[in-house]
Amino acid sequence: MTTQFSVAGVELELLRYPAQQESNLQAWDAADEHLLKSLIESEQAAVPTAIVNDSFGALSCGLSKLHPSWPLFVETDARTSFLGTEQNHGRNQLPMDNLQRFTSRDTLPENLALVLMKLPKNLSYFAHQLTRLSQVLPAGTRVLVAAKAKSINSALLDIFAKHLGPASASLAWKNTRVITCVSDGKPRPLAKEVTWAVPEYQLEISNLSNVFAANKLDIGARIMLENLPKGNFKSIVDLGCGNGVLGLRTAQLSPEADIHFIDDSEMAVASAKANWARNQLPADKGHFYWDDCMTHLPEEVQPDLVLCNPPFHQGEAITDHIAWQMFLDARRRLKEGGILHIVGNRHLAYHVKLQRLFKNCTTVASNGKFVILQAQKK
């Protein structure tokens, strides 16, 4: 894994978060390099700057390296992004007192003079972010968005025009481009929240914009719901909860249990919490954590069941380290006799990992694409 970042005279050591990941993944990409290179070559002044979707702090570290007092306002939905930014500022002995952190639901400051963004995969979420910016940016404010050249097309430029202002793309460099959008100063309203029913379980669900499966059950969740374990569970974790549908259904099946919802996405945790209230479940039985797996779960929480639908993407990277960490955390935190119950794509071969960690693994159900697996802590 390459950890030495070098562009236009800026030298940094950058690691992904958590640091123990596959050796072929690094903490930045060419789009980060292109954005910093453009700023340095244009001799950009250290004005109040929002940094949006900075995966592990490459952009904030780069600007802090250039000017330790550069006022930075960092927005992300991912807890691991905040933790990675802290980690890399520390590794490079860079200050953090010039940096304020925001989730994608927090109110943004109104004194921004420049915005730097990485293009997220989820364009509905991107539109949400542009709309938020339209509510605080004065006319004429530049918003620079770096992305792979192949991701930039007329439809993407139309999203800029609809939600913030006119935009144009730079020439390509290392297969990336920087889009320059100029705010037109017209505030847009945020899109209305979409709510949809899951009639077979008498549930009503809503998702915020960066939550997987926008307005219907995804296939993995559906097969999981059809095969939830039955038992006298007292403490249940919905790990990587998304909109919380698995935990909500489990609460119906085990009304005496405490349900703990955990996700790296702040919007996912907020959606799960809203859905808990929407479905009139007991306020004292639902617990919600914005966290990197179970890293900061209170020690007194000792689940007897962990439900998990592991992601195999982190941003643009395809990786199984998140699933591996989820399984490790489950083994560490489960009570003796507790159960890990997961769904995954068949080709990911999670049964091998579970057999290695738990010394047992049972196939509960499967179809052409997905498999439900269960392992018990003994």
Swiss-Prot record:
Superkingdom of the organism of origin: Bacteria
CC per GO annotation: cytoplasm
Keyword Cytoplasm attributed: yes
Gene3D superfamilies from the UniProt entry: Vaccinia Virus protein VP39
Pfam families: MTS
Alphabetically ordered keywords of this record: Cytoplasm, Methyltransferase, rRNA processing, S-adenosyl-L-methionine, Transferase
InterPro entries: DNA_methylase_N6_adenine_CS (IPR002052), rRNA_m2G-MeTrfase_RlmG (IPR017237), RsmC/RlmG (IPR046977), SAM-dependent_MTases_sf (IPR029063), Small_mtfrase_dom (IPR007848)
Protein name per Swiss-Prot or TrEMBL: Ribosomal RNA large subunit methyltransferase G
Gene label: rlmG
